Design a protein with these regions (language model features):
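Hydrophobic, regular-secondary-structure patches
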Residues: 1-68, 74-78, 85-97
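Short, intrinsically disordered, mixed-charge
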Residues: 9, 41-44, 110, 114, ...
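Extracytoplasmic
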Residues: 14-16, 62-67, 97-101, 117-119, ...
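Generic alpha-helical propensity signal that fires on short helical segments
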Residues: 22, 37-39, 63-68, 82-90, ...
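Solvent-exposed, non-transmembrane alpha-helical starts
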Residues: 27-34, 59-61, 77-82, 98, ...
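Extracytoplasmic segments of membrane-associated envelope/inner-membrane machinery
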Residues: 72, 80-121
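Short glycine-enriched loops at secondary-structure junctions
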Residues: 73-75, 166-167
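Basic-flanked hydrophobic alpha-helices used for secretion and membrane insertion
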Residues: 104-107, 117-174
């Protein structure tokens, strides 16, 4: 009623799509470059991004926390204002050494006490589809490093992490 909700919506407007396409059946859509090209020709379409968004669990130094991972292309960072929202570290999804890197929300980073150190990987965990029980040992894990910390608003800061699209694909294929 005092306009604060408008300020919150504006703060995440560049990373929240105006149009989202979901599959009619199932959870996934195969990326079709010809279809994406056709969609891109529609008047008013500025950018098209394939995003894998899934709930996962992260593990760091013995702490475990659920988050929402957004697997995005490197172009996503340049075409949104994500790099302007970085409050620590950098805005990249692959380290200069070629390692997987993540950009974490401020709340996630603070809660997990994440560090910019190569010797302390962050484990991105997703249920192994071949496992027959629910436990930490039944999770597929990908090691990643902290590249940066962003701050949009409390809701996003407390639950979202960005990773390379290929990391999202690898997690889901486990």
């Amino acid at each position: 009623f005092n306009g604060i909700d408008s300020v919150i919506k504006m703060s995440e407007a560049s990373v929240t799509p105006a149009v989202t396409i979901y599959p009619q059946n199932g959870r996934f859509i195969e990326r079709d470059s010809l279809l994406l090209e056709k969609i891109g020709e529609i008047e008013g379409i500025n950018h098209i991004h394939s995003v894998i968004q899934e709930p996962i669990v992260i593990k760091f130094k013995g702490s475990i926390r659920p988050v929402v991972i957004k697997g995005v292309s490197p172009h996503y960072i340049q075409q949104t204002d994500l790099q302007d929202k970085i409050v620590g570290g950098g805005a990249y999804l692959t380290s200069p050494e070629g390692e997987d890197a993540i950009i974490a929300g401020y709340g996630v980073a603070a809660d997990m006490d994440l560090e910019f150190r190569r010797d302390n990987p962050i484990l991105l965990c997703y249920p192994d589809k071949n496992a027959n029980r629910a436990s930490l040992s039944a999770l597929s894990k990908i090691e990643s490093r902290l590249a940066g910390i962003f701050s949009y608003n409390q809701e996003m800061d407390n639950k979202v992490m960005y990773a390379d699209y290929k990391v999202g694909e690898r997690l889901l294929k486990c």
